Swiss-Prot record:
InterPro entries: Aldolase_TIM, Thiazole_synthase_ThiG, ThiG. Its EC number is 2.8.1.10. 1-deoxy-D-xylulose 5-phosphate binds at G159, A185, G186, N207, T208. It comes from the Bacteria. GO terms for cellular component: cytoplasm. Homotetramer. Forms heterodimers with either ThiH or ThiS. It catalyses: [ThiS sulfur-carrier protein]-C-terminal-Gly-aminoethanethioate + 2-iminoacetate + 1-deoxy-D-xylulose 5-phosphate = [ThiS sulfur-carrier protein]-C-terminal Gly-Gly + 2-[(2R,5Z)-2-carboxy-4-methylthiazol-5(2H)-ylidene]ethyl phosphate + 2 H2O + H(+). Catalyzes the rearrangement of 1-deoxy-D-xylulose 5-phosphate (DXP) to produce the thiazole phosphate moiety of thiamine. Sulfur is provided by the thiocarboxylate moiety of the carrier protein ThiS. In vitro, sulfur can be provided by H(2)S. This is Thiazole synthase.
Amino acid sequence: MIMLNIGPFSFHSRLLLGTGKFPDFDVQQKAIDVSEAEVLTFAVRRMDIFDAKQPNLLEKLDVKKYKLLPNTAGAKNAEEAVRIAKLAKASGLCDMIKVEVIGDDRTLLPDPVETLKASEMLLEEGFIVLPYTSDDVVLARKLQELGVHAIMPGASPIGSGLGIVNPLNLSFIIEQATVPVIVDAGIGSPADAAFAMELGADGVLLNTAVSGAKDPIKMAQAMKLSIEAGRLGFEAGRIARKRCATASSPLEGMSVVE
């Protein structure tokens, strides 16, 4: 398969994995291992990255094996998002940041105005910017025009497990994209992840679908395989949909039974 390129980075895996809500560190580590994810994301606000006394996933992981993707979850406006991003960068984690500015506490949908503003500010600061956005086609285009390094439209609300509720909009975003499109939020099953890849997405970021599964380790492996299968299917090219049947066996040379 073709590698996933985000800014200056290249990855074999197209699965980006969140690190929250796992039952314990052991399950988390095993799930990460079997997923073969190379990019791990985490909320900076949920980890005291400057307090050595506070346990966190960075103590348990061989961070040299992964590209860390801090996110700005908890930010309510662009200024807060930029402040969180700078904290992550100051800790030496990474200059790649997932911009997440929530505009509604019930749906956890992103604030489009503040997301645009935060993305522009962080680009000016030299960050590699991956904004979490809705499936708004125009907003995705405006983010792309700013110069973001990837676009991360939600399949459905965060943690909902509803899967892709608006495949048409998602396909429009993918068709117009000149940067990678990473489907983020709402993925509930391997079928959802495969569908995203079959639509032409460049990758999938998920968390709850794995960490909240009855067996997170098995689900992590299932997600890995479904994303690989979906991407291979997209690259191979599906057959055209037709209203009428077409025989799969050749008819030439067949004898006629009278």
